[in-house]
Design a protein with these regions (language model features):
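Structural microenvironment flanking redox-active thiols in thiol-disulfide oxidoreductases
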Residues: 1-43, 54-64
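Sec/Tat-exported extracytoplasmic proteins
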Residues: 8-11, 15, 43, 93, ...
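Short coil/turn linker and secondary-structure boundary residues
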Residues: 30-34, 93, 137
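Thiol/disulfide oxidoreductase modules built on the thioredoxin-like
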Residues: 43-45, 51-103
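Non-globular targeting/processing and membrane-anchoring segments
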Residues: 100-139
């Protein structure tokens, strides 16, 4: 959680979404959403934290952990702007490496956004004429 808090403080919210996942392996009765809210308040965690659901058919690994092939906690997953898992770490990862990888993904997303904006501007600047050609009909 301290590293996630540093990421949230370092990168702009429009560039990087920080989301926590509360996983429960034991003492389920004590690990309620209410106790999680108290923990987040006490430790001043200011990013969303989801509560993982129990494993399917009593499996010991919670559902989201299974879906993302997480080996345990802590796990850190970097997902790019297209929704593709690009990096995943089990255990600690250095802030320097993580910062460089996040910056790389932000730069890729910004470049993709710029290319999309340029393409839209080019399409808008081309005159639209009504009629049909080999490609189809415009209105």
């Amino acid at each position: 959680l301290p590293q996630a808090t540093r990421i949230r403080a370092t990168f702009a919210a429009e560039d990087v979404a920080v989301i926590g996942l509360h996983t429960v392996f034991e003492h389920h009765a004590a690990m309620t959403p209410t106790s999680l809210q108290a923990f987040l308040h006490e430790y001043r965690i200011h990013f969303p934290v989801g509560v993982d659901r129990a494993g399917i058919d009593g499996a010991p690994t919670p559902r989201t952990m299974s879906a993302y092939f997480m080996q345990g906690t802590p796990t850190l997953t970097l997902i790019d702007a297209a929704g593709v898992i690009r990096y995943q770490y089990f255990g600690q990862v250095s802030d320097m490496l993580l910062g460089a990888q996040i910056a790389e993904l932000v730069q890729e997303a910004n470049a993709l956004h710029s290319r999309s904006a340029e393409k839209m501007a080019t399409q808008k600047s081309q005159p639209q004429t009504a009629g049909c050609d080999d490609q189809g009909c415009t209105i």
